[in-house]
Design a protein with these regions (language model features):
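Glycine-rich phosphate-binding loops of nucleotide-dependent enzymes
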Residues: 2-250
Length: 250
């Protein structure tokens, strides 16, 4: 994996307004290729807004976002996958009336020539094999034929991850990947994230402090829309400002 000093994602002087309310205040930071980074902060810190800006959900009011040196600040969200960026959102987004295998196959088909009406049978066989491989990767091989709507919540989240991986992303953005999960499901998801981090850059938003402290190499702490601190878990634990506004609340 490329672990050079060149950032895979660079946020430069980003601010975001909603009317007169300023949700993000002049945030500048870089994300290195190969790093697993968590964005944390108390409620109202601006985490969701920041995630939406870097994932293309909303454009910054000022400042820029660059992916591999390319300005993506105003890129249409549907072009992110082709650029090499995949997203997994807090609210599970799967086709509940389709099987787990069909969900992943649909995601794979969207990455191929979508305007080709007639495809060789071999192409479908290849897509099916790739879908099976992704289901194995996320631990859903035994649920291949189950309807997505019949899967447990944690399994649906894992299925969504498989769909996100269908585009072979260099960067995976995850919003609250363990939201609504049982302790057992959380362990499974965090293990999956750890495995994926060996192959790609991951940026996630997460409220469960103990999980990110033990999993991530780097943390960003937001507070009232400002970047309060960034660094290793040890750096964040020892930061007096972080203790005051966030860690001290738990």
């Amino acid at each position: 994996m490329n672990t050079s000093a060149v950032p895979i994602l660079e946020v430069q002087a980003v601010s975001r307004y909603f009317g007169k309310f300023q949700a993000l205040h002049n945030i500048t930071t870089r994300f290195k290729a190969g790093e697993l980074t968590a964005i944390i902060g108390p409620n109202g810190a601006g985490k969701s807004t920041f995630f939406n800006v870097i994932s293309g959900g909303i454009a910054p009011s000022s400042g820029t976002v660059h992916f591999e040196g390319r300005d993506i600040s105003s890129m249409a969200q549907h072009n992110y996958a082709r650029a090499g960026i995949a997203k997994s959102f807090q609210i599970t987004n799967v086709f509940k009336h389709l099987s787990a295998h069909e969900n992943v196959r649909v995601a794979l088909q969207m990455q191929t020539s979508r305007y080709q009406i007639f495809r060789p049978r071999a192409v479908y066989a290849e897509l099916s094999d790739k879908a099976d491989a992704l289901l194995v990767k996320v631990g859903l091989a035994n649920s291949r034929s189950k309807l997505a709507g019949d899967l447990a919540h944690g399994q649906q989240r894992s299925l969504e991850v498989a769909m996100a991986l269908a585009c072979g992303p260099k960067l995976l953005l995850m919003d609250e990947p363990t939201a609504g999960m049982s302790p057992q499901e959380t362990v499974v998801m965090m293990d999956l994230i750890s495995q994926m981090a060996a192959e790609r850059t991951i940026i996630l938003v997460e409220h469960k402090m103990k999980l990110v402290m033990g999993l991530c190499k780097r943390l960003l702490v937001l507070h009232h829309g400002e970047l309060l601190a960034e660094g290793s878990p040890d750096d964040i634990r020892s930061n007096a400002d972080v203790k005051r506004v966030y860690l001290g609340q738990n």
